[in-house]
Amino acid sequence: QDLPGNDYSTATLCLGHHAVPNGTLVKTITDDQIEVTNATELVQSSSTGKICNNPHRILDGRDCTLIDALLGDPHCDVFQDETWDLFVERSNAFSNCYPYDVPDYASLRSLVASSGTLEFITEGFTWTGVTQNGGSNACKRGPNSGFFSRLNWLTKSGSTYPVLNVTMPNNDNFDKLYIWGVHHPSTNQEQTNLYVQASGGVTVSTRRSQQTIIPNIGSRPWVRGQSGRISIYWTVVKPGDVLVINSNGNLIAPRGYFKMRTGKSSIMRSDAPIDTCISECITPNGSIPNDKPFQNVNKITYGACPKYVKQNTLKLATGMRNVPEKQTRGLFGAIAGFIENGWEGMIDGWYGFRHQNSEGTGQAADLKSTQAAIDQINGKLNRVIEKTNEKFHQIEKEFSEVEGRIQDLEKYVEDTKIDLWSYNADVLVALENQHTIDLTDSEMNKLFERTRRQLRENAEDMGNGCFKIYHKCDNVCIESIRNGTYDHDVYRDEALNNRFQIKGVELKSGYKDWILWISFAISCFLLCVVLLGFIMWACQRGNIRCNICI
C-alpha cells in the first residue's frame, strides 16, 4: 500500500520484548493465572527412593531397634560403640532377648538418637552377696543362655539376697547415661526363688532426681517362653553428681554408662535402601534435593531440607509477561510494538528493536535493559531458599498411650504450622511473581521512554510501541538510536520538513470531505427556505388554506 510518507524519506522503529508460543501460568497477588515466558518449579514432589550416605553418616539398624542396640540384645552386638548422624530403623526390626518394656520409651529413644553414639564405658560396680550375670533361655548368645550385654541380672546367692547400696560418682566433665531395670516375675514362687524376699524394690537416686520402683508380680502373655517382664529405666548423672542404687531384690543393674554427646544426630524409621550418593536432605521416602525452597514428600526430614507444604506445585516466574506473537500484525507486516504483542524468536535478549527503512527490515536486542531485568530476577530463587530451608531436622514425635492428649495437641500444632507455612509459601511466591512481572514491564517502559527522549520531534509515537521517524534513517542511524548516540539536531530540519509535507497532504485530503459535508448542509437549508417561502406566498393569495383545530 502506497501511504503518504511511507517512502524512503521515513522509517519505522518498533520496540518489543521476548515471547514464546506456549508460556507458563503463574499466580500473582492480582491474578490467579497469568502467563509468563518462563517459570521455575519451587516444590520438590519426589525423592530418589534411596538414602544417601554422604555427607551424613547413616547407620542402618537392619533388624535391630535403637533401644535393642543400646541394651545389648545378642543379635545387635555389631552396633556396640557405633556412631551416627542418622540412625535408620527398619520395619522388620525385632527384639530377641528377655521381653521388656520401657515406660518412657520415646524419651530414651530420642535422647540416645540425638547423642549420636553407643560408646559404652564399663565401670567397677561392687555387688556383694548376690549372684551376677544372670541369663535366660529367651536371650541366647549362641547355644547358651544369655542376657543384655549392657545389663547385669542380679539374683540371690545361696539363700540370701542382702540389701544393696552402691554409689558411683561422676568425676568427669560430661553427662553419663545409666541404663538399669526392674524384673517383674510371673509368680510369687519365681520371686522367692530368685530374690528370697516376697517383695523386692529398687531406688535409684542422684542429687537431682529419685526413682523408686516396686516389682509387679503376675503372669503376662508369653513371649519367647517367658511370662515375666523387665522394665527398663534410665538416669542421667551430671558432672559432679553421684549415682546411688539401693535394692533388696529384682534389680537389673548397670554395667557402666553411655557417654552422652550434644549434637544434631537423629533417628528415622524408613525402609528406603542406603546408597553411595550425596544429598543434604533425607526423608523416610529417601533423599531429596534441597535446591528448591519447598517439598511435599514427607513431613519428617533430616538435614538442610526444603520446608514442607501442602501444595503439589508452586511456580516462581523467572521471565516476563508472555504475549504470544499475532499472525497478522497491521500495516507494517512483521513490524509491531510491545503494546500489540511480544516477539517470538528473540534468542539474544529479552528486549529489542525492529525497524523498517530504505535498506529493508532488521532486528536487534537491547542488552542493557535485558541484563538489568535478569540481574533482578536471578537472585530470587536463592533468596526464597534462604528464607525457607530448614537448617535442622524435624524429628518423629512419639508419645505413650497415657500421653494421648499431648500427642493430639502436638499433632494439632504440627498441622497448624504446616497450614501456616503453606499459606505463607503461596503469598511469598505470589508477591515475588508480581514483582517480577512489574519489573520486567518497567524495563520495557524505560527502554521506550529512553528512545522517545532521543527522537523528540523527529518522530511520532504511533501508539502501538512503534515510532514513525520523519527523516531518512539508514541502518547506521538506527544503530545510533539503539546504542544511545543518536543526535536529533542533525536530522531536525529534514524531519520537520517531511512532517509538514506529510501532514499537509493529509490535511488537503481531509478538506475534501469537509467541503462536501458543508455543501450538502447549505443545499438542504436553501431548499427548506424556498419551500417555506412558497407556502407562505400561496397562503396569502388564498391558493392554500390552512385550518387549525384545537
Curated annotation (Swiss-Prot):
The keyword Transmembrane helix applies. This is Hemagglutinin. Keywords: Clathrin- and caveolin-independent endocytosis of virus by host, Clathrin-mediated endocytosis of virus by host, Disulfide bond, Fusion of virus membrane with host endosomal membrane, Fusion of virus membrane with host membrane, Glycoprotein, Hemagglutinin, Host cell membrane, Host membrane, Host-virus interaction, Lipoprotein, Membrane, Palmitate, Transmembrane, Transmembrane helix, Viral attachment to host cell, Viral envelope protein, Viral penetration into host cytoplasm, Virion, Virus endocytosis by host, Virus entry into host cell. Binds to sialic acid-containing receptors on the cell surface, bringing about the attachment of the virus particle to the cell. This attachment induces virion internalization either through clathrin-dependent endocytosis or through clathrin- and caveolin-independent pathway. Plays a major role in the determination of host range restriction and virulence. Class I viral fusion protein. Responsible for penetration of the virus into the cell cytoplasm by mediating the fusion of the membrane of the endocytosed virus particle with the endosomal membrane. Homotrimer of disulfide-linked HA1-HA2. Its main location: virion. A lipid is attached at C539, C546, C549 (S-palmitoyl cysteine). The gene is HA. The chain crosses the membrane at residues 515-535. It comes from the Viruses. The record marks R329, G330 as: Cleavage. Glycans are attached at N22, N38, N165, N285, N483.
